[in-house]
Amino acid sequence: SRWTSTEAPLPTEKSATGKEMPSIESANRSSKKSRRTRHDQDKLMPGAGIEVFTSSDGFKIFVGRNADANERVTHKLARPNDFWLHAEGPGSHVVIRNPGRIKEPSQVALQEAASLAAYFSSARGATKANVRWTQVKHVRKPRKGPKGQVYLRRANTTLAEPVSPKVLFAPPKPTKHV
């Protein structure tokens, strides 16, 4: 399978032939543990460095504000069917929660999350920025890679205007009735 990197070339991997396989019991124990962890994900608090927004059409959006927060957003809070976004260059990892397991995010949620990804990146001062997006199951962390670095597969690109969350999610101004 082909992977593309957001920050570094794709490393080559050697096969693990000749390596001892863990016993079936230990494999079952580890799979039960990972299942339990997945069910507990809703209980995880976003924590320091993570901002949470709600799109206009009701989707939760998580934004990592530093390398540690990016790691937590992408690899701890996000589920495989959630949508992951990142603007070109250094910036925040953004995740759109996908509880209904839909194949593509709504255009509203995608554009709002892409605007946040562009705003919380080195493209903040630009008029438009390319933002790559995919499902979290297509995002991988390289072995021994620095925090926040990922490889993508099957990524799409959208163009977004960097918009501050204060502007993007501002309450509507009241209208005057005369």
Predicted regions and their residues:
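Extended, highly charged segments
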Residues: 1-93, 97-178
